[in-house]
């Protein structure tokens, strides 16, 4: 999944990544 260019916490990104 691609995360939008928003100031999201690393945990969020990481989880999706």
Swiss-Prot record:
One of its GO terms (cellular component) is extracellular region. GO terms for molecular function: toxin activity. Expressed by the venom gland. Keywords: Neurotoxin, Secreted, Toxin. It is found in: Secreted. The keyword Repeat does not apply. The keyword Transferase does not apply. Signal peptide: none annotated. Belongs to the scolopendra toxin 8 family. This is Scolopendra 7913.19 Da toxin. It comes from Scolopendra angulata.
């Amino acid at each position: 999944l691609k995360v939008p260019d928003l100031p999201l916490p690393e945990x969020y990104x990481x989880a999706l990544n």
